[in-house]
């Protein structure tokens, strides 16, 4: 399927690559560009660069990148057409795509979209059933008594599933949706004896569950009558996977980046109340342990995570287990310890929003400080525990990435062992990896003073050892990229076969085709114009190559002369072979080389 180029251009112009990439990668400004951990491969040192000026991104580790379309294709594993549609929806530009024109893989994506559509459509009627029907009055009163205002209910899209086995089933069927697909989406259940379908959620308050893009992919149905289970969640489906979903991430992402911290709670009800109280960087898992997928996504946003679990034994055990794992994953871990037996919802209900935000602000501890405070009685009364936990806490502190945070932890933890911070520091067994990283490759790093060392410009590693001829080819191409007039003036000055670097030869050919369709060169359009990742990398590397703002007199002509020397050298080589053929008396070879020389001379005329 072909999409009108004007639509593609409009979407590209309205989509800022920095905003787009920032939804997936925590970026820091380094010079004119932004840099962060690559979302396409595992790495500890940032190698993913975004150029706001040029509207491109590139990883010089795994080499992936491009403009907004290529980034979306890679990050979502979708086709170009789907990427255009996705970004079009993002900037409110309509793109008409018929599902029948997709291949099988795209059809799968289309099924996923239909599942999301079903969830979002039924949400409107769940909300109506809660706020406008007699059957929903008891559920609405239950929410209001627990501090849910009309505005909060609307903001969160909370609804009510009537006590009917076919409300959702009939609603979707009347609108032409595939009932089997609704079952696969988790909205319906199935009787395995007669294969009849019925509503999964009945007589429950419905809380929509959204993915990172803010689309509804599941529900949590809460009882208000005391029936079990207390919460009934959507099952695992193609669009709803608990190990990948963090509740409220779509709303909290901007605050997480701004505050450089994420606060993890146990349940989504705690998140709603905490967010309402003013704590905007809060998320929760869906009743599961924090998964590797969760941690990978968190690391792209921030390296600082605060755990605020329930103030009971189970919450304490979960805090210790989760915090230890996060610390080993290279995150800075903090803990807010709620009063015994309380969760955030209960704390806010008892003391109010202001008291809660003040408590969160003032009661934050490092994970090491929290851990030692939990274990203090055992440390004080058991020598074996004293030795064991001294080693454990020393190791925990050694895992902290900031020397300032380490010193703070030493000061907090040392009194529990009746030693000085200096004595505790002596016990620390640092990891085998050196504390300071000295870059010896293209990935950049940090010097001995903690200062960041810029990696090489995007894609330039492959052009480290260029010959005099290749350097001329690179500079010549860079000038041709300035404007179309320069290209037209010099295009016929060189023979493409004279390029010794095949990458540069292909770029020369691409420029010819590109300028045939465009009046102005820009890298964002150029990388979209080609299909080869290798060629995209070459284009990006040339974009990063800096020349004088204006060429000096005859500069481009000098490059042309160097490039054309290859042609002259070829003639000299043919003359040498002709003389050798004459010396040995091979008439056929003499004739062949003479024809080659004549042809070469004609090319240069």
Swiss-Prot record:
Residues 260-341 form the Toprim domain. It is an enzyme of class 2 (transferase). RNA polymerase that catalyzes the synthesis of short RNA molecules used as primers for DNA polymerase during DNA replication. Its cofactor is Zn(2+); Mg(2+). The gene is dnaG. GO terms for biological process: DNA replication, synthesis of primer. InterPro entries: DNA_heli_DnaB-like_N_sf, DNA_helicase_N/primase_C, DNA_primase_core_N_sf, DNA_primase_DnaG, DNA_primase_Znf_CHC2, DnaG_bac, DnaG_cat_HB, DNAG_N. Its EC number is 2.7.7.101. GO terms for cellular component: cytoplasm; DNA-directed RNA polymerase complex; primosome complex. Contains an N-terminal zinc-binding domain, a central core domain that contains the primase activity, and a C-terminal DnaB-binding domain. The keyword Transferase applies. Belongs to the DnaG primase family. It catalyses: ssDNA + n NTP = ssDNA/pppN(pN)n-1 hybrid + (n-1) diphosphate. Monomer. Interacts with DnaB. Pfam families: DnaG_cat_HB, DNAG_N, Toprim_2, Zn_ribbon_DnaG. One of its GO terms (molecular function) is zinc ion binding. PROSITE patterns: TOPRIM. Binds 1 zinc ion per monomer. Binds two Mg(2+) per subunit. Mg(2+) 1 binds at residues 266, 310. It comes from the Bacteria. Mg(2+) 2 binds at residues 310, 312. This is DNA primase. A zinc finger (CHC2-type) spans 38-62. Keywords: DNA replication, DNA-binding, DNA-directed RNA polymerase, Magnesium, Metal-binding, Nucleotidyltransferase, Primosome, Transcription, Transferase, Zinc, Zinc-finger.
């Amino acid at each position: 399927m072909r999409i009108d180029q004007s639509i593609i251009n409009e979407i590209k112009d309205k989509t800022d690559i920095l905003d787009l990439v920032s939804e997936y990668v925590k970026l820091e400004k380094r010079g004119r560009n932004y840099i962060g951990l690559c979302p396409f491969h595992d790495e500890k040192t940032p190698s993913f660069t975004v150029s706001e000026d040029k509207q491109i991104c590139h990883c010089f580790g795994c080499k992936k990148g491009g403009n907004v379309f290529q980034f979306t294709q890679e990050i979502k594993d979708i086709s170009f057409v789907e990427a255009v549609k996705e970004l079009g929806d993002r900037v409110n530009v309509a793109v008409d795509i018929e599902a029948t024109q997709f291949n099988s893989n795209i059809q799968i994506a289309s099924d996923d979209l239909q599942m999301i559509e079903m969830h979002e459509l039924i949400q409107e009627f769940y909300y109506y059933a809660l706020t406008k029907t007699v059957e929903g009055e008891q559920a609405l009163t239950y929410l209001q008594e627990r501090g849910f205002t009309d505005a909060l209910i609307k903001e969160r899209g909370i609804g009510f599933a009537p006590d009917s086995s076919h409300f959702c089933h009939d609603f979707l069927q009347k609108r032409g949706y595939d009932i089997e697909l609704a079952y696969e989406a988790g909205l319906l259940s199935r009787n395995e004896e007669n294969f009849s379908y019925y509503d999964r959620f009945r007589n429950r308050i419905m809380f929509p569950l959204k993915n990172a893009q803010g689309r509804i992919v599941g529900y949590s149905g809460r009882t208000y009558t005391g029936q079990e289970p207390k919460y009934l969640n959507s099952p695992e489906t193609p669009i709803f996977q608990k190990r990948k979903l963090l509740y409220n991430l779509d709303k909290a992402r901007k605050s997480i980046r701004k505050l450089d911290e994420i606060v993890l709670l146990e349940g989504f009800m705690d998140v709603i109340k905490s967010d309402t109280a003013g704590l905007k960087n809060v998320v929760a898992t869906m009743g599961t342990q924090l998964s590797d997928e969760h941690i990978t996504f968190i690391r792209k946003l921030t390296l600082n995570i605060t755990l605020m679990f329930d103030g009971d034994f189970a919450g304490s055990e979960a805090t210790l287990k989760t915090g230890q794992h996060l610390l080993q994953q290279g995150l800075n871990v903090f803990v807010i310890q709620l009063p015994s037996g309380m969760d955030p919802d209960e704390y806010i209900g008892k003391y109010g929003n202001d008291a809660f935000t003040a408590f969160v602000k003032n009661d934050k501890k490092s994970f090491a400080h929290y851990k030692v405070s939990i274990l203090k009685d055992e440390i004080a009364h058991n020598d074996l525990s004293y030795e064991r936990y001294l080693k454990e806490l020393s190791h925990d502190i050694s895992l902290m990435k900031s020397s300032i945070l380490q010193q703070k932890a030493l000061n907090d933890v040392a009194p529990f062992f009746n030693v000085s911070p200096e004595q505790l520091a002596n016990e620390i067994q640092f990891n085998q990896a050196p504390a300071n990283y000295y870059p010896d490759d293209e990935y950049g790093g940090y010097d001995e003073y903690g200062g960041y060392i810029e990696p090489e410009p995007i894609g330039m590693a492959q052009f480290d050892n260029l010959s005099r001829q290749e350097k001329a080819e690179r500079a010549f191409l860079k000038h041709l990229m300035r404007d179309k007039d320069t290209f037209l003036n010099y295009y016929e000055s060189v023979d493409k076969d004279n390029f010794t670097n095949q990458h540069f030869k292909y770029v020369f050919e691409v420029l010819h085709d590109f300028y045939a369709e465009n009046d102005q060169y820009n890298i964002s359009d150029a990388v979209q114009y080609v299909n080869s990742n290798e060629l995209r990398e070459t284009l990006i590397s040339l974009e990063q190559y800096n020349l004088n703002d204006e060429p000096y007199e005859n500069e481009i002509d000098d490059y042309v002369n160097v490039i054309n020397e290859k042609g002259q050298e070829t003639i000299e080589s043919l003359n040498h072979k002709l003389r050798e053929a004459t010396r040995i008396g091979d008439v056929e070879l003499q004739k062949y080389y003479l024809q080659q020389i004549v042809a070469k001379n004609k090319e240069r005329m």
